[in-house]
Structure formats: structure tokens, C-alpha cells
């Protein structure tokens, strides 16, 4: 396992991005609010990203108890290597996101988190809002399926 202390993005997986370089996948730390609570997220951009492009996007939902720097970040990075703009976020009350009590994992909150990530990424420069996908890992997968049932922006899950 990679040592997160040696990585400015604190990613914990082998092969993780350690710096942004031209011509490679780059990551941008971003934040937005859900009902007044700060949400921490990372946007992964493909090597050929331009803000004037029309890139498909994918929201990546982490497992229960996970954070964006773990497996969700790995999937987000790998998908960006395939040409997608991706967003991996810390759910409300978890990781670097705000909210109390900490470590709460309620289905309604997680579905709202997914929809808010979709709101953010579909407004991101260079993203084609009509080509939005959703990937959920473990518990995030169940929440993703439920969120996609009512949010028709997601064209694939």
C-alpha cells in the first residue's frame, strides 16, 4: 500500500497520482455545500482535458466507512485514464466533509450526496451534462442504484 504521507492528495492506493502533470490525469480538490454542510471532493480530469470539451462524467460513490482517497479515488482515477471526468466525494458526516454527528451513514443522506455530486460535476467546465454515469462501490453501489431510480440525469449505473 502506498504511504499517504508521501502524497499531497493523501491517496492510499498504489499507482496514485502524486502530482498534477501536463498530459496526464490530473486531480483537483473541490468543495460544495449540501444544506449548509461542506462536502469535500476530488475531480479527476483526463490527460486530454480542456474546459471547452464535452467530456462524459461519472460520479463515484465510496463504500460505507470509506473515503474519497481510498477505492473510490482509485476507480475515479482509472476512469479518468479512459477519458471521463470523474468526481469522488466524502459523504456528508464522513471523511473531510462536514456535519455532526460524525460517521453517520443514512441512506437518504447518501442519495442526497450522490445527487449533489451530480449537480456539481454537470456544471463543471468541459463536462457534457447529457452523458452522466454513476459508479457505486459496495454500500455506495446500493445507494447509487436507489439514487438513479429517481434521478434521470444518470444514463448508466
What are these regions (language model features)?
Residues 70, 93-105:
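Glycine-rich "HGGG/HGxG" loop immediately N-terminal to the catalytic nucleophile
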Amino acid at each position: 500500500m502506498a504511504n499517504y504521507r508521501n502524497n499531497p492528495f493523501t491517496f492510499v492506493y498504489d499507482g496514485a497520482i502524486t502530482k498534477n502533470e501536463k498530459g496526464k490525469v490530473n486531480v483537483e480538490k473541490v468543495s460544495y455545500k449540501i444544506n449548509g454542510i461542506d462536502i469535500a471532493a476530488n475531480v479527476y480530469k483526463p490527460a486530454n482535458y480542456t474546459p471547452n470539451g464535452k467530456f462524459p462524467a461519472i460520479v463515484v460513490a465510496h463504500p460505507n466507512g470509506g473515503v474519497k482517497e481510498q477505492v473510490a479515488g482509485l476507480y475515479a482515477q482509472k476512469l479518468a485514464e479512459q477519458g471521463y471526468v470523474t468526481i469522488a466525494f466524502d459523504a456528508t458526516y464522513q471523511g473531510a466533509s462536514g456535519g455532526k454527528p460524525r460517521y453517520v451513514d443514512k441512506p437518504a443522506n447518501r442519495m442526497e450526496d450522490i445527487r449533489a455530486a451530480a449537480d456539481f460535476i454537470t456544471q463543471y467546465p468541459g463536462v457534457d451534462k447529457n452523458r452522466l454515469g454513476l459508479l457505486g462501490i459496495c454500500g455506495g453501489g446500493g445507494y447509487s442504484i436507489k439514487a438513479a431510480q429517481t434521478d434521470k440525469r444518470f444514463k448508466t449505473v
